[in-house]
Amino acid sequence: MIKSLKLIVIVIAVLFTGCKSVKSVSNSGVLDSIITSKELIRAHKKQDFKFKTLQSKVKVEYAQGNKSQSYSINLRMEKDKTIWLSATFGVVRAKITPKRVSFYNKLDNTYFDGDFSLISELLGTELNFENVQSLLLGQSLFDLNKRDFDAEIYDTSYVLKPQNQNTLFEIFYLLNPSHFLMDSQQLSQPLDRRMLQIDYNDYQEVEKHILPQNIKVIAVEDNEETIINMEFKSVSLNNDLRFPFRIPSGFEEIEVR
């Protein structure tokens, strides 16, 4: 049951976009060898645009070892308030708010209803609503203004790395030189043999705003690797949306221990 919960939590954490104004965004850009870390952070923060709601269809491909599955998910978001996910026919549905993480699975008649502290303990790293929302929007998982960074160039991206890297929890941010959203976010806990890498392979323009189009998540624990690919289609912004969620009666609660 715990492995099943881990799968669902990972999918939530990383889902954690047809619309006439949608088009692909070029990932090419001119790299400036003398740009400072503060300039990069300011440019990245400018991309955190304001919107009321977001809606998208998401194709999710999941692989672990010899096992692979694919899902079609409807994603709805009210910025800073709600992230809502529903698989085809509502077989699996989730609702995430700043205070709660809830989902149910009609395939095995189970549900989970708890706060982020339980999920953080399960994953071995602190997680909150803002982290999940930022991940979906190509923003940094953690506040870049709370640490001092060095800036350098790697391949076709800018790299931000903490000046005082924590050996227990290492993190690197790779920024796209065209629009300064994330190319990749890489977190590792070497002593625990854990690694999480989030790659933003493509972006798209929606109503003059830049949003992720393809996200790839690689999670490694010991020698076990999980890969999740997500493609965001039919994205629309600022429509009136509903977020229906009610745990069916008679379902068994999933307990995290």
Explain the meaning of each model-derived region.
Residues I10-I12:
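Cleavable N-terminal export/targeting peptides
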Residues T82-E130:
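An acidic-aromatic
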Residues S70-N74, R93, Y111-D113, F172, ...:
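Well-ordered beta-strand positions in beta-sheet-rich domains
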Residues L15-G18:
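C-terminal motif of bacterial Sec signal peptides marking the signal peptidase cleavage site
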Residues E121-Q163:
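Hydrophobic, well-structured mid-protein blocks that either form specific transmembrane helices
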Residues S21, D150-R257:
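Gly/Pro-enriched, hydrophobic low-complexity segments
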Residues M1-I8:
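Bacterial N-terminal signal peptides that target proteins for export
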Residues K23-R100:
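Start-of-domain marker
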